[in-house]
Amino acid sequence: MLQGLLKPVRRRLGVWFDHLAPRGCALCDQTLAPGAFPGVCMACLLAMPGANRLRCARCGLPASASADRQACPCSTASPGFDQTVAVADYAAPLDRVVTSLKFGRQLNLARPLGELLAARWLGSSPAIHLDCLVPVPLSPSRLAHRGFNQTLEMARSMAATVRTPLPVMPFTLRRIRDTAPQSGLSLDERRHNLVGAFSCAGRFDGLHVGLVDDVMTSGSTLTESARVLKAAGARSVIALVVARAMRDSPA
């Protein structure tokens, strides 16, 4: 499935791949061959857990070809976003790359992660239309402590990878209060933790918004963000995540 995805995406992006590819694979540090998929070698692409799995189009949780749509948790607890695009599962080796970017300050990893996300979006079937990208924001205090927002850096990389204009709007969705870290909280605690945490400084009337985040676990952050974006007029909100964790994951 993933191999089939790469060919049309590579054709669509054309020679940009050869110019954008960093020197080494972001997952294993192996030197990339000329013309390789940007950022990640083929061996690591094929080895990423969940890269080839069928997923619920709405929430991104694993599904099977014969699965009853009603069996998915989002059939009874609908998320605020309309669809999910996920590169792979939150598992080795992808989890190490995500945490190295987020907590290890390895900003060079934002580019290959954004490129992977762009490839997964471009390979979506049916095609998903996006008008703009909005990164999930950090609170001012957390941004000051970390020094950067990893989701903004990934969104910029994603936008730079595609040929069609895809504006990144980093300052419209705002986190207006500090919240406890989501990791380690129960599902209910995650939901309550984020109520009233976001506001929107602009309008998105009629737009299809790509909401970028690194990891989705319960979906609470994306749900609350999507609620605020739709209140600001967004026609649809598509969750774009590098890694999809299970709901009981500590991520």
Mark where each language-model region is.
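Glycine-rich phosphate/pyrophosphate-handling loop used in enzymes and phosphotransfer proteins
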Residues: M1-A251
